[in-house]
Amino acid sequence: MTDNNLTIDRFLTPFVVAHQAGKPIVTVLRIDRLDRILRRCIEEQESRVQCVDCRAIYLIEKAFNPVNPFATSMSVDRLIYALGEFVHSPWLQDDVEMQAEQWRFVRAIVDTVERTPGFEERHMTPQLERQITMLRDHVRWGLHRTSQARGRR
């Protein structure tokens, strides 16, 4: 996670703005903890002691809450669909470097979910597979555009 140099508090604004505009996406709570949560997920996955139904995914889910503030977690598929809504909302910052970081942020979450032992066997459906493919295509496109924009500066 540190390779991507993610500064998580920078991502608070687009989520909050989208939520306040009434967009049907999740609000990210405790986002300052998200990079620690993702790092811990990766560490736990690498130790191979956690399955997808256990702590690794739960830690990601805890960072995201549906509009209902009393909900404590969401399912893996709901997390992926929420990310899909997020990338289709006007969430990108004007700054090219910031855009690249935001795309890497989305990619980091998808990577973390997919690398979790047991994810594919227990949770993958044709719809979810299409959603993940769409997210990966969006990330590829977004990073390509930011790379081109950097070259024009």
List the model feature ranges, each with a label:
Residues 120-126:
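Short, glycine/acidic-rich hinge or "gate" loops at secondary-structure transitions
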Residues 1-92, 99-119, 135-153:
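Charge-rich, intrinsically disordered N-terminal extensions
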